[in-house]
């Protein structure tokens, strides 16, 4: 029997909008748009693009950026209930985020433990924001992911695990290639279709939960736990 493991993106997945894009639109000079486009067309890596975007912002903007994000972030419907449901089933749940710790941690406070969150670190010690990459690509990845989701998945999972990825964007494509099943929407949905990856479409965590409970490996895992509880 395979053990289900859930790996979930943050920006545009847990939250309704991409917080990095929101930050750039509100605080950054116009140069950020070319960096974004260059990432999407793969002219530069995600790590290069995101790092350079944040270098456009001054470190003394930290509090303003944090307040802007925390005051206006919308969590996708059903997320907390889904996390509680997964935890109750004793299924590991990890957040793999290309976002920054100074806004990811506060948003997920009380829902996901920090040790289960993998994201980038923003440093405010220099004039402009510098991004540090504690979860950069391992020896098996040369894509310059920044927060390398495939590398984290390799670190977290074992051969007999059933990996479920939840995502929406370009930063989730490589992770989806390593998953047994991907819940996808938006850009990632189109990529899954084009690449022939096993996937299901979702819009909220409410409909995702309904589909999640029908996955064969999840049902088998839940049945095993129920039987063990009775014995």
Curated annotation (Swiss-Prot):
It comes from the Bacteria. It catalyses: 2-hydroxy-5-methylsulfanyl-3-oxopent-1-enyl phosphate + H2O = 1,2-dihydroxy-5-(methylsulfanyl)pent-1-en-3-one + phosphate. Signal peptide: none annotated. It is an enzyme of class 3 (hydrolase). Pathway: Amino-acid biosynthesis; L-methionine biosynthesis via salvage pathway; L-methionine from S-methyl-5-thio-alpha-D-ribose 1-phosphate: step 4/6. Keywords: Amino-acid biosynthesis, Hydrolase, Methionine biosynthesis. It holds the Pfam family HAD. GO terms for cellular component: cytoplasm. One of its GO terms (biological process) is L-methionine salvage from methylthioadenosine. GO terms for molecular function: 2-hydroxy-3-keto-5-methylthiopentenyl-1-phosphate phosphatase activity; L-phosphoserine phosphatase activity; magnesium ion binding. Its EC number is 3.1.3.87. Belongs to the HAD-like hydrolase superfamily. MtnX family. Dephosphorylates 2-hydroxy-3-keto-5-methylthiopentenyl-1-phosphate (HK-MTPenyl-1-P) yielding 1,2-dihydroxy-3-keto-5-methylthiopentene (DHK-MTPene). This is 2-hydroxy-3-keto-5-methylthiopentenyl-1-phosphate phosphatase. It comes from Bacillus pumilus (strain SAFR-032).
